[in-house]
Every structure is written in structure tokens, then in C-alpha cells.
């Protein structure tokens, strides 16, 4: 049995493309309706007041306003409306 694979048989060089997950907006920042706040897999951050959740668990703003984050047993993201 050959213990060499032959020329040109590269075994390395594979890596998946990054998915750019995480917070897109910090607490205290101003956002507009529809702005993406968090991209995530599962619910690391949970939607609270004026925040919607997409089918891929993305959190987005339902109103214009300021982002507020609150940590209890879970981390909640909400948007306080601004005039």
C-alpha cells in the first residue's frame, strides 16, 4: 500500500466563510424602523419592547428610537421611541 498520496493532493485549505453574527447596534444608539440590532443563531439576546424577531432569530427595530439592553435571567433588547 502506498503511504504517499501522489502529487497535487492537498488535504488542507478548507474553512467556512464567517457569518458576521453578533450585535450590530450598541445600547444608547439611535435606530430607525427595520434596523437590524442583532444577528444570532438561537436566542442569545431576546426581543423586548418594540423589537421584532425574524425566522433566523435576527432582532430588528419596530420603531424609530434608542436601543436599551437589560440583563436579568436573559438579555433583553428593546427600543424606546423618540419623537
UniProtKB/Swiss-Prot annotation:
It comes from the Bacteria. InterPro entries: Ribosomal_bL27. One of its GO terms (cellular component) is cytosolic large ribosomal subunit. GO terms for biological process: translation. The keyword Ribonucleoprotein applies. Residues 1-25 are annotated as: Disordered. Gene3D superfamilies: 2.40.50.100. Keywords: Ribonucleoprotein, Ribosomal protein. GO terms for molecular function: structural constituent of ribosome. The keyword Ribonucleoprotein applies. Pfam families: Ribosomal_L27. This is Large ribosomal subunit protein bL27. The lineage of its organism: Bacteria, Pseudomonadati, Chlamydiota, Chlamydiia, Chlamydiales. The gene is rpmA.
Amino acid at each position: 500500500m502506498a503511504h504517499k498520496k501522489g502529487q497535487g493532493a492537498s488535504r488542507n485549505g478548507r474553512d467556512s466563510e464567517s457569518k458576521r453574527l453578533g450585535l450590530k447596534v450598541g445600547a444608547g444608539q439611535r435606530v430607525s424602523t427595520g434596523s437590524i440590532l442583532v444577528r444570532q443563531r438561537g436566542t442569545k439576546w431576546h426581543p423586548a419592547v418594540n423589537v421584532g424577531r425574524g425566522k433566523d432569530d435576527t432582532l430588528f427595530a419596530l420603531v424609530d428610537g434608542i436601543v436599551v439592553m437589560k440583563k436579568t435571567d436573559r438579555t433583553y433588547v428593546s427600543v424606546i421611541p423618540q419623537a
